[in-house]
């Protein structure tokens, strides 16, 4: 799949950015704080409806009261158009081929991306929440059933936790709790099942990529870690454990197990990478994981996602940079942000390059 | 809004905006439409709103909206009195009745169990439903709460209460879009959902 055009309005520091003609390889250059990362983030947002911010409001350009991102897409021979608009007010408007789409789950997945960024290191070092988020965004882009189950699970969980949080005031009605637990098990088991299947595929692709980078010296793996012992019939195991934990959940006022408590462990030579990998090893691990994400999407929908590369060559010497770029050469579309654009241009002589300044296009030099 | 230095107009727009499905733009359009209309027409509208508000009550048996209590459905001799369909809102009765596929009685529970909105079973007409099942000769209860999380929880909760009473409990088939509400489902979908109901 390829993004053929991009129009960004009031997104973060970008006032108006019109890129009517995108290429296979697109280099985005500019000074610090000019809006290069924000440009990549606008593509990421157009695809996943996610930002690194807690609220959409934070992504509205200071002083403005809405933002919008539009993109033209070529996907398996078909032309599509995507549009997302936030505000004024708090409503999000989604459009697909000009038609309003009411549900996020009918929109996400139309444009699929893998984002390589500096802060990816948090996947290894950070909290389980960050790893769950990465898995959710990845799988949701290729599996709408997953996104729907996840949304349902989240909604049921919010109701149940509300009941539990008020348990100290008013003992919750056991039958009501059970009515929510039943739905929690149903949607939760579905979420876990799909995540576990994804983790199996990802682990293999992850190890392969990592072997290629580490010259076969290290083995890497991923392991989905469920917050309860999930053997046999998942739904039954989840239900049984919830039943057992009910008094504890009432005492603590919250739901103690389920996909919202699960984790995914990064391992290197069998040990948890969070504790046993060096800085450089952690960098290579997250890089390998991102490549595994790419393979996962490619395998799931038989189509290549769009690749966003935000200064991933940072800290690498020339040989490694060249080696890393070779991974990307066969991919149909790349957006590359780099402070060393001249060097990237030498590697990709056919690339289009866009210079950003103050959140707008400074000039567009397109090579033919 | 400087463009309307007119308190009564702003008040009218604000009142209209409170209604479901009416945004600020529609509220403005309606307000201007009313102001352009003949005074007699506006009086007719205001009168009918007041009249309906005064005459229409909830049926003391099924909580449908009605001028005569009990309502026409509850007193009809042509309905199957061994079947009760449980719905969230009076609006849902209209949607289901229009399909013609259901010939039993109704019971409106006035909402769904929704902890996030602070609504528990005791806030709904569930006790009244259980009393009806005990008194009347009911053989089957069809639960037609909305297919969203709260509606689903209500269905599970009701089936747990009703099944021990020896009454068959079924759920409207999942022909409807998830998260949708009954009043927006079309008649064909609803009729299919009634015919394909599954036992709980
Ligand atoms: N909602 C917003 N409104 C206006 N500016 C914003 C908003 N959110 C973020 N910014 C600003 O956008 C600026 C540009 O950010 P961006 O991360 O895109 O820079 P960059 O070009 O990638 O720089 P670097 O080369 O340092 O990575 C930042 O200074 C940031 O404060
Ligand atoms: Mg940046
Ligand atoms: Zn009645």
Segment roles from a protein language model:
Chain B
Residues 2-9, 31-84, 89-93:
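Cys/His-rich Zn2+-binding cysteine-cluster or related metal-binding knuckle/ribbon modules and their
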Residues 17, 35, 50, 63, ...:
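Signal for well-folded cores of large energy- and translation-related assemblies
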Residues 27, 76-142:
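Extended interfacial segments that mediate partner engagement and assembly in macromolecular machines
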Residues 58, 70, 92, 109-112, ...:
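Glycine-rich, flexible loop/turn motifs
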């Amino acid at each position: 799949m390829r993004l053929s055009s991009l129009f960004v309005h009031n997104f973060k520091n970008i006032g108006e950015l019109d890129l009517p003609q995108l290429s296979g390889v697109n280099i985005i250059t500019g000074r610090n704080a000019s809006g290069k990362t924000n440009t990549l983030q606008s593509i990421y947002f157009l695809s996943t409806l996610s930002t690194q911010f807690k609220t959409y409001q934070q992504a509205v350009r200071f002083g403005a009261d809405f933002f919008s991102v539009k993109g033209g897409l070529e996907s398996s021979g078909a032309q599509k158009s995507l549009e997302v608009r936030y505000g004024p007010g708090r409503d999000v408007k989604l459009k697909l081929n000009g038609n309003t789409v009411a549900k996020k789950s009918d929109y996400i997945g139309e444009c699929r991306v893998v984002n390589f960024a500096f802060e990816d290191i948090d996947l290894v070092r950070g909290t389980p929440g960050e790893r769950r988020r990465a898995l959710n965004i990845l799988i949701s882009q290729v599996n709408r059933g997953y996104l729907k189950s996840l949304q349902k699970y989240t909604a049921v969980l919010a109701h149940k936790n509300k009941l539990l949080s008020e348990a100290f005031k008013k003992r919750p009605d056991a039958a009501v709790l059970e009515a929510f637990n039943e739905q929690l098990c149903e949607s939760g088991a579905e979420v876990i099942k799909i995540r576990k299947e994804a983790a199996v595929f990802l682990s293999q692709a992850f190890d392969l990529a990592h072997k290629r980078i580490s010259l076969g010296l290290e083995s890497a793996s991923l392991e989905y870690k469920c917050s309860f012992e999930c053997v046999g019939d998942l739904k039954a195991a989840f239900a049984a454990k919830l039943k057992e934990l009910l008094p504890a959940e009432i005492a603590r006022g919250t739901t103690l197990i389920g996909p919202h408590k699960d984790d995914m462990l990064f391992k290197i030579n069998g040990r948890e990478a969070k504790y046993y990998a060096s800085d450089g090893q952690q960098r290579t691990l997250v890089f390998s994981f991102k490549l595994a994400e790419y393979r996962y999407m490619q395998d799931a929908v038989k189509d290549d996602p769009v690749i966003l590369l935000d200064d991933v060559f940072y800290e690498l010497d020339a040989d490694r940079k060249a080696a890393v770029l070779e991974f990307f050469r066969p991919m149909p579309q790349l957006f590359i942000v780099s402070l060393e654009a001249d060097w990237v241009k030498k590697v990709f002589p056919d690339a289009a390059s866009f210079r950003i300044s103050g959140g707008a296009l400074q000039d567009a030099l397109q090579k033919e | 809004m400087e463009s309307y230095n007119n308190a009564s107009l702003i008040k009218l727009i604000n009142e209209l905006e409170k209604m479901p499905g009416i945004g600020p733009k529609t509220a403005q359009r309606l307000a201007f439409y009313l102001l352009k209309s003949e005074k007699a027409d506006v009086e007719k509208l205001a009168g009918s709103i007041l009249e309906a508000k005064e005459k229409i009550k909830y049926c003391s048996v099924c909580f449908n909206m009605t001028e005569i209590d009990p309502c026409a459905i509850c007193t009809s001799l042509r309905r199957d009195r061994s079947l009760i369909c449980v719905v969230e809102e009076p609006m849902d009765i209209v949607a289901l009745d229009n399909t013609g596929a259901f010939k039993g009685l109704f019971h409106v529970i006035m909402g769904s169990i929704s902890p996030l909105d602070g609504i528990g079973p005791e806030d709904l007409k569930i006790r009244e439903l259980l009393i009806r099942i005990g008194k009347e000769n009911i053989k089957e209860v069809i639960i037609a709460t909305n297919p969203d999380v709260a509606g689903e929880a209500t269905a599970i909760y009701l089936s747990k209460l009703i099944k021990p009473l020896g009454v068959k409990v079924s759920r409207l088939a999942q022909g409807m879009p998830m998260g949708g509400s009954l009043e927006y489902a079309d008649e064909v979908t609803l009729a299919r959902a009634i015919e394909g109901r599954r036992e709980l």
